[in-house]
Amino acid sequence: MSKIYQIKINSRTYDEWYYTDLLQNKVNVSYDPINYKLFNNDIVMEVLCDTSNTAIQTPRIKVVDSIISKNKNIPGVLILKDNKTYGRLERKDTLDLSGSAIKKTPGKLLYKCIPDDKTLPPFLIPYEFKHSNFSKLYSNLYVTFSFSKWNDKHPIGTLTNVIGEVNNSNIDIYYSYQLLCKNLNISIEQFNKTLFNNIKTRFDSSTIDLNKITNEFVLSQYPELENRTDQKEWNIFTIDSVNTTDYDDAFSIKKIGSSESCETYMLSIYISNVALWMELFGLWDAFSSRVSSIYLPDKKITMLPTIMSSNLCSLIENAYRYAFTMDITISVINYDSTNEKDIMIENIEFTNTIINVSNNYSYQQDCLFLNPNYKTLFNITKLLSEKYVCQYDITDSNHMVAYLMILMNYYCAKNLKKNNTGILLKNNITTMPKGAGLHNESDNFIKSWYLSKSEYFGVMNKIDTTSNSPHISNHESLQLDAYTHITSPIRRIVDLLNLVEMQQIHDLFAFSKEARQFYNKWTSEDHILFINTNMKSIRKLQNECTLLDMFNNIPEIIEKTFNGVIIDIKNNIGSNNTTVYMVYVPELKITCKITKQTTKNYELYNQIKCKLYMFPDEYNIKQKIRLEEVVDV
């Protein structure tokens, strides 16, 4: 019986490799992948071959499946800078009309191409300059290519696309290349097309006219939803960055009772109900594989079509919009003798509403401070943060919004966990020690960072409600027994999925069969793995691009020494005993890794001195920016 293995290659030099069986168990197989021209993750089968002049059969292997060989768009850098070539592609015969060869035509020159995938060897790719360059100063190119053959030392590839020159001054090209490298260049063309067609069908029109989606239209589609469109009764407002167009969340605060020693308020958090728009225009089957919007320094790549993210789903002022709403009934107790206040959450309810936002404010905007409802909301939120969910230092509107998002994410997570459904975040958060000596701003950032980098898991697949399952999240640093994401459904698929499920368990809306199929598909284990992988790639891409943009716009930061805080530690025992430190630099509001061999034992939340350095990297960009520790001599 033939044996099947998978090859695992750890570097492009092929100096570290091993084989596994199909269950990913290591096996003692010694076929040299260079001799057999194998790529990382190739599936091979062991076969017996007759040896010449003997009756002995010798075991050999042949490739039965190869992801790399089938990939038509492998990203890499074509090395043209020094005009170094590696021979030519085979010569081709030119035929006359009778079919007879009349002369030999030289093939294109071969240039080295370095794949972005560090497990792949250098390729040779035929390339011909389109225009003469008398200065002979060529730039390396970001390209994609496909595998052609591998007969000699280097595999041969075929160019499929030229993205642009490797040049720090053309950052857009670098962004496009990185999207390809991290498999994030996912099209939403079909999503857009379906949306446009369904809108035109709905209004029996040959063109898209968003003016037809009036407030009256929004109100008429789901008349059973609670109507909160009267701006005199409901002062609902958003608070976001000044350039925001996709308003996910909004707030209102109403006094609903008072006595001599107590005042009662209803604090409402409104989240754009993207799911109702998906249902209204029949878009569940058209959703792409984008799991999140991507925010780059100069552009935004949205998860949803722009018509949805910046218009229909966005909580724009003076426009009727669907909102999933959390109403919190709060009692504020006044102590006359000490002039102190205490706060109690009396009740939390979830409902669907149609809202009419009064104002789209930006953080710390002057007119925001003139709104008496904002002042009340700020003071009540500050009291809540001292007692409920987590200690969060609130000194401005940005902190207030961040805390209210944590609050809603937490209470929705408790609901989902109680009902054994939804998507939660895994427990990989370490307790924040008291007296760590961190500034409150750093404390807030670290709490938010831990939540954003946690991995998701499907509750149905992981939680045993009859026992204390080790899979149940326990976010100790935030004093949380569960946590999820639901407050950003315009930009994150997990939030959209949890939004659907929260409405389901509270009987707020009867979704279609297509919606349930969408939910079941994306909460399967393989799709949650896909979400986690892509979210990690997106965070890495955004961080790298932010660093590069910062260097281009503020080059003097390279000369400066910064204070950093260690917020995560990982020991790589199998990699020369190196330690990877994740460091937060408060002054720059960025996180960077420092990888080093060290005898010094750092602990979480230790503060260190660090600098940004540039390293040459001809295979990626002209300078790679890394954070390094500054060691006092």
Feature locations, PLM:
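Feature marking long nucleic-acid-engaging regions of large polymerase/nuclease enzymes
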Residues: 17, 28-31, 127-130, 145, ...
